[in-house]
């Protein structure tokens, strides 16, 4: 689950448990934070339709932010959340009152503004996008 849905302490504890147990922790779609990395455990970085943590200020996929985070030694896999199935046609919404500075920083969204995870399917921004996500050495 994402930072915000879970506290910093909960994410730290989960990552320590993942490291000790030999399993991976999933970030949730809210982005990769230092709290997910705290215990040295393996990470499955989830990217959803809102591109949180890997987006431009305009909300588009940012291949440079993606590459920087994907290269982290603890990130062992990347999960692409293809759509918001729990709320078809609506998407997920984090109310503006919950978008504090720290959450805004990790998600790459403005502080104090409603944060929407679109219901639409995950889009690769260019026909060659699969190669950009995979990287040149894949």
Where are these regions (language model features)?
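Active-site entrance/lid segments in N-terminal catalytic domains of soluble metabolic enzymes
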Residues: 1-138
